[in-house]
Amino acid sequence: RGMGSRVTASHTTAMGSYDNAYCFKLFRLLKMSGINFVSCPTESIHLQGRFDSFPKRRGVTRVAELDRAGMNVCLGQDSIKDPWYPLGNGNILRVLDAGLHICHMMGFEDLQRCLDLVTDNSARTLNLGEGYGIAVGRPANLVILDADSDYEAVRRQAKGRVSIRGGKVLMTRVPERVEFTAA
């Protein structure tokens, strides 16, 4: 009781196999609880259902449905080059790209705010509160991406231009330049 936002359910892959009627009832209770959800879509799509005969389960939780129902859901990766997901590399934009595909979140509204799944929603899951965001008095921890929108950041897998931690610049990147020669 009263734990609410201090509780996070990770993976919740079984939810992808529940029928809609059950999920409708479950979502009401989950929303009232105020808990957070973290999905690791690259790991889930790899691990879940791999030994099923056809049709195979997708094995990923209902990210889009949780989000649209007003619950806090974020994406992550908990396997970095290990037996559970050997291609894990910690690149959160790659996870987001895969997650948007896997979770059928290619609609206009989803793409306009997709970075929330790996930024704002993640900060809410971690209960960072006043320790997160850009405002006077808050720690200056941020990465500036070489993109002008969430959509472009994911579509182009934008690289960080500047990384700042505690107000100190840790890294800057000069944009890549490609020159074509006449054939």
Predicted regions and their residues:
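Active-site core of metal-dependent hydrolases
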Residues: 1-59
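His/Asp/Glu-enriched, well-ordered alpha-helical/loop segment
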Residues: 4-6, 43-47, 58-145
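Short low-complexity, flexible loop/linker segments enriched in glycine and/or proline
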Residues: 52-56, 89-92, 160-162
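C-terminal cap of metal-dependent C-N hydrolases
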Residues: 136-183
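Short Asp/Glu-rich motifs
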Residues: 49-50, 85-86, 156, 182
